[in-house]
């Protein structure tokens, strides 16, 4: 794949309104150029998408649907659903899965009312699998199904059960104290299993699953990446079902071909905006932006949602770099005011680089507003405008903190930071497309779902990028704010931040089973948190994608198809 290795040159003077205007020194983040040239993206293709394969997929889907309807054992039904989810093809069978899990939930409720031991399976693995799948799909199930045997009494020999409990524990809420405690006990035993069996070939597949889970639990992983990984693992299992494996591979390649076409179109759009040409300090990350959109919603039916989401990601990246790196305080204050007023008539007051950015923003938001008005019958533009203005206001506050050397405490930082994370703006756009509910239900987007997702992204970003951003002279991030306020060490502050991320996930889990918002929106909000944990797991995957495994993720999802043999 072609790469440009040369460092980008950064403009060092403003776009002067008059020849006499003095030069202004600008900061530079020295972001690397895009690793994905437009011409290369246009060359992407998938040779596995053929007419006979399309017919084969139809037949395989019929076979799997038959399996779902005819599988009798309750544990076997749950295992089939779990396998379909992990392979990334469960979206084809939503009705069958909902029917099965509804029946499981009804039996669970009856057992509770009749005071029957709900740990009826006789083993930890099955109980934890049932718990995880029901919680994952929004059904109410209490932690007491485990009958208290989820702590020090765990059987070290039951690694399959311990792994199942470990995965289930990450669907806890704030009130599930026993379940949350089990994370410590299961993690300890799983790590011991990995160490003891490092040279044991008989336990290879299970050990691989355990290592993968310890790196990041299944509930917090990006579904599409997990499907790519699990298809390979599943193919090595002795109990593999060839029908499921073949469907997963064919479907992955078909969906990838759709994604490739969308990426080509978006790359052309990005090139035509001219933003990276005229604002050469901006991160050129259209491919990474689209990867994030796929992480939020990968299903073929959400093509327009991904297109809109990617454009929003790129506009946010551009504006963030203006505030974070390039703009003077005077320019940023003026830009914020004009965004607040949404006043195109004041365009001439802006320097040239800001004119292009603002006009591009206005055009894209108006287009989104047009489609929502056409398809749903209500005008969302005032809401969208307000969200961009609020985000820019938080960007401006952070710029002022930097210019003045002000050090906010942790609470003050987070009050500003959850909005500057851009998640409220992103999710508001998605809500407009996904739901027919009134926008007022979000409460000016200060809803627990939005706030929790924003907290995850804000803090995951901070944990990954703090050292780099501070090195170039940036505002203190959450880790440094906590250290400065409490006197804690960096390690202690990072552990504290990780704890807050965990609480945010607890709140998202609670909303999944109790919230009245559109279920697709709830899943998208959680997926945005998953994307954040993925992109920033090994470093700044947006600013330096080659150093944080983002490049590998892009290749596996958008470049390389799965071989069928």
UniProtKB/Swiss-Prot annotation:
Any one Gene Ontology molecular-function term assigned to this protein's record:
terpene synthase activity
Q: Does the keyword Magnesium apply?
A: yes
Please tell me whether the keyword Repressor is annotated for this protein. no
What are the binding positions for Mg(2+) 1 in this chain? 320, 324
Reactions catalysed according to its record: (2E,6E)-farnesyl diphosphate = (3E,6E)-alpha-farnesene + diphosphate; (2E)-geranyl diphosphate = (E)-beta-ocimene + diphosphate
Recorded GO CC terms: chloroplast stroma; cytosol
Function noted in UniProt: Predominantly involved in sesquiterpenes (C15) biosynthesis. Using FPP as substrate, the major product is (E,E)-alpha-farnesene with minor amounts of (Z,E)-alpha-farnesene and (E,E)-beta-farnesene. Using GPP as substrate, could also be able in vitro to synthesize monoterpene (C10) with (E)-beta-ocimene as the major product and with (Z)-beta-ocimene and myrcene as minor products.
**What is the protein's given name?**
Terpenoid synthase 3, chloroplastic
The species is: Arabidopsis thaliana (Mouse-ear cress)
Gene name tied to this protein: TPS03
């Amino acid at each position: 794949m072609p790469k440009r290795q040369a460092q980008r040159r950064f403009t060092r003077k403003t776009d002067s309104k008059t020849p006499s205007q003095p030069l202004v020194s600008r900061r530079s983040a020295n972001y690397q150029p895009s690793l994905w040239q437009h011409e290369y993206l246009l060359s992407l293709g998938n040779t596995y998408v053929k007419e006979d394969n399309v017919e084969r997929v139809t037949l395989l889907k019929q076979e799997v649907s038959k399996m779902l309807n005819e599988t009798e054992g309750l544990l076997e039904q749950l295992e089939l659903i779990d396998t379909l989810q992990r392979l990334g093809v469960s979206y084809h069978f939503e009705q069958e899965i909902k029917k099965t899990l509804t029946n499981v939930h009804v039996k669970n409720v009856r057992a509770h009312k009749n005071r029957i031991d709900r740990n009826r399976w006789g083993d930890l693995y099955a109980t934890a699998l049932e718990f995880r799948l029901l919680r994952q799909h929004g059904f109410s199930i209490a932690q007491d199904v485990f009958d208290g045997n989820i702590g020090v009494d765990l059987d070290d020999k039951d690694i399959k059960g311990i792994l199942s409990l470990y995965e289930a524990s990450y669907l806890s809420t704030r009130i599930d104290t026993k379940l949350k405690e089990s994370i410590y006990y299961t993690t300890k035993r799983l790590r011991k299993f990995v160490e003891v069996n490092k040279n044991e070939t008989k336990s290879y597949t299970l050990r691989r699953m355990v290592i993968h889970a310890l790196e990041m639990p299944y509930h917090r992983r990006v579904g599409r990446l997990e499907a790519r990984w699990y298809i390979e693992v599943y193919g090595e299992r002795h109990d593999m079902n060839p029908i499921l494996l073949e469907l997963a591979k064919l479907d992955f390649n078909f969906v990838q071909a759709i994604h490739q076409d969308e990426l080509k179109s978006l790359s052309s759009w990005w090139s035509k905006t001219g933003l990276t040409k005229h604002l050469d300090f901006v991160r050129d990350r259209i491919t990474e932006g689209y990867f994030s959109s796929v992480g939020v919603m990968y299903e073929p039916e959400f093509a327009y949602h991904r297109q809109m989401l990617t454009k929003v990601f790129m506009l946010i990246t551009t504006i963030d770099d203006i505030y974070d790196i390039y703009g003077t305080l005077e320019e940023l204050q003026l830009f914020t005011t004009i965004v607040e007023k949404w006043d195109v008539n004041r365009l001439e007051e802006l320097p040239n680089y800001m004119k292009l950015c603002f006009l591009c923003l206005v055009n894209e938001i108006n287009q989104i507003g047009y489609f929502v008005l056409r398809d749903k019958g209500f005008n969302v533009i005032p809401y969208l405008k307000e969200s961009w203005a609020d985000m820019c206001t938080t960007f401006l506050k952070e710029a002022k903190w930097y210019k003045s050397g002000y050090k906010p405490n942790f609470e003050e930082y987070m009050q500003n930071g959850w909005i500057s994370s851009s998640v409220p703006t992103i999710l508001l756009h998605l809500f407009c497309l996904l739901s027919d509910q009134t926008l007022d239900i979000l409460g000016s987007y200060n809803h627990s779902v939005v706030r929790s997702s924003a907290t995850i992204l804000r803090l995951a970003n901070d944990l990954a990028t703090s050292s780099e951003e501070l090195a170039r002279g940036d505002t203190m991030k959450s880790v440094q704010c906590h250290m400065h306020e409490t006197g804690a060490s960096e390690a202690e502050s990072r552990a504290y931040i990780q704890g807050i991320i965990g609480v945010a996930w607890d709140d998202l889990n609670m909303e999944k089973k109790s919230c009245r918002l559109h279920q697709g929106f709830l899943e998208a909000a959680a997926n945005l948190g998953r994307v954040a944990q993925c992109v920033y797991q090994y470093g700044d995957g947006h600013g330096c994608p080659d150093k944080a495994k983002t490049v590998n993720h892009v290749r596996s999802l958008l470049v390389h198809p799965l071989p069928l043999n």
